[in-house]
Curated annotation (Swiss-Prot):
Family: Belongs to the PsaI family.
Organism per entry: Gloeothece citriformis (strain PCC 7424)
Membrane topology: Single-pass membrane protein
Domain of life from the UniProt record: Bacteria
Residues passing through the membrane, by range: 12-32
Gene assigned in the entry: psaI
Compartment(s) where it occurs, according to its Swiss-Prot or TrEMBL record: Cellular thylakoid membrane
Function description: May help in the organization of the PsaL subunit.
Protein name (record): Photosystem I reaction center subunit VIII
Keywords: Membrane, Photosynthesis, Photosystem I, Thylakoid, Transmembrane, Transmembrane helix
Pfam families: PSI_8 (PF00796)
GO biological process: photosynthesis
NCBIfam families: PRK11877.1, PS_I_psaI
GO cellular component terms listed in the entry, alphabetical order: photosystem I; plasma membrane-derived thylakoid membrane
Amino acid sequence: MTGAYAASYLPWILIPIIGWLMPAVVMGLLFLYIESDA
């Protein structure tokens, strides 16, 4: 996979990932960290 090919479809994939997938992953990891620590 070349950089130019990835750049053509990366923005519209990256926007929803950053928008709702990353916060969900961060919340899940924080929850697991807090639960395992308690």
